[in-house]
Design a protein with these regions (language model features):
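Viral structural modules
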Residues: 1-192
């Protein structure tokens, strides 16, 4: 079997060819994802409970629903810069100093850093009637702290991104009959 050698071609560069340039881009040392959940007990005041029961007494407003509104989550941002708290309803911050640790990775021990991160959010919980009209609202804040082992050498910029904040009411969201509940549990999940 014989092979034919390819003909050598001279390809000229276009007149507008780009020259090679160096650009500065961030180097990613580590990336972690997790789901962090916290439960909060939400209590209605006597006045709020009275408004809920008045709405439930009106058949044209039943059923009532409990809904929760989570804040807009910002895009990836640096924790090392002072302007990282641009969103008033959401915070991500490093608590304390990072600590050097040695951890096993693939059978070898490597140096890493242990970092405690605190995630905090403001959530608005509303009771609405069948038409979506607000009966009462309750503001609630929730925080969760988690330790992460990272490759975080000196001079590295720590970035934070929460892809979503989810709130749910495990006991259900529909209110049909009196008496109105005086409290319920709200479960908040931070997707980091």
């Amino acid at each position: 079997m014989s092979y034919t050698k390819h003909k050598t071609r001279n390809i000229s560069k276009a007149a507008n060819s780009l020259q090679e340039e160096c650009i500065r881009v961030p180097k990613v040392y580590d990336w972690v994802t997790d789901q962090l959940s916290v439960k909060k007990k939400i209590e209605f005041t006597h006045e709020q409970k009275k408004k809920i029961e008045e709405a439930m007494d009106d058949p044209s407003r039943r059923p009532l629903r409990i809904v929760c509104e989570t804040p807009y989550v910002p895009p990836l941002f640096s924790l090392n810069k002072p302007d990282h708290d641009q969103c008033e309803d959401f915070y991500c911050e490093q608590v304390g100093e990072k600590r050097d640790v040695t951890v096993p990775v693939n059978g070898e021990f490597v140096d890493a850093q242990l970092v405690d991160l605190l995630f905090t959010t403001e959530i608005k919980v509303k009771v609405v009637d069948r038409h979506g009209c607000e009966v009462v609202d309750v503001n609630c804040n929730a925080s969760v702290m988690e330790s992460f082992v990272l490759c975080y050498p000196h001079g590295t910029e720590l970035m934070c991104e929460i892809s979503k904040i989810v709130c749910r009411i495990p006991s259900g969201t529909v209110l049909l009959n009196c008496p109105a509940p005086s409290c319920f549990t709200l479960e908040i999940t931070f997707c980091v």
